[in-house]
């Protein structure tokens, strides 16, 4: 009979909280995130989907560096405004947090006014109207944020812009999926 010394080490785990925010009226549920460890291996449960409140809380993780990447579907109407991917340090006994903010991917309409000889014409006024169904139309209104029927172009008045000295104008920050 021989004595043997055995050492047990208690490892205290940490957790990772991913917080999803969407500018405007977008849903917080169902956004997909891949989480990998320092070796590039996906952790159990990855990819994760955000809940109704936009949060994900992972199971216990070993302390160390993890990479969190938002997985946006191809052709998504949203764009990630945060760094993507992001690296975060999980510390034992603590919950590391990382946030991702998305915004609607807006569009723009550029107009260049020229005459028959291709000379650019300044001072021409254009009205831009929008509709959700193609039946009821209304002028775009000034808005600094992306909203249905909004436009952030400087000088917009009653849905109208006037071409500059180069005969150009841009209706910008237009909400996608509408008729213009």
Over which residues does each language-model region extend?
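Solvent-exposed loop/turn and edge beta-strand elements of beta-rich ligand-binding domains
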Residues: 1-180
